[in-house]
Amino acid sequence: MAEENVIYVGNKPVTNYVLAVMTQFSEGADEVKLVARGRAISRAVDVAEFIRNNVMPEVEVKDIEIGTEEIETEEGDTISVSTIAITLAKPSE
């Protein structure tokens, strides 16, 4: 998947990310990957479900990857942050 088809979910409203996904699909992308860490994970799930249930019901969840990233703080400690990557795909015709 091309890097331009990846949307990093952060603190913006869900509608911003829904619009970004719709834009990617309208520009010809077959797949779009939503990537989030920490507190933004629930927002990424909300975006995927909003797209599937309200905007583009033909879109399918192709893959969900979960994991943990080790991040070093300014104090030198290491903390673990949960991650998720949700791949949405248009059905093949």
Swiss-Prot record:
Belongs to the histone-like Alba family. Its main location: cytoplasm. GO terms for cellular component: chromosome; cytoplasm. It comes from Methanopyrus kandleri (strain AV19 / DSM 6324 / JCM 9639 / NBRC 100938). Pfam families: Alba. This is DNA/RNA-binding protein Alba 2. Keywords: Chromosome, Cytoplasm, DNA condensation, DNA-binding. HAMAP family: AlbA. GO terms for molecular function: double-stranded DNA binding; RNA binding. GO terms for biological process: chromosome condensation. It is found in: Cytoplasm; Chromosome. The gene is albA2. SUPFAM superfamilies: AlbA-like. It comes from the Archaea. Gene3D superfamilies: Alba-like domain (3.30.110.20). Binds double-stranded DNA tightly but without sequence specificity. Involved in DNA compaction.
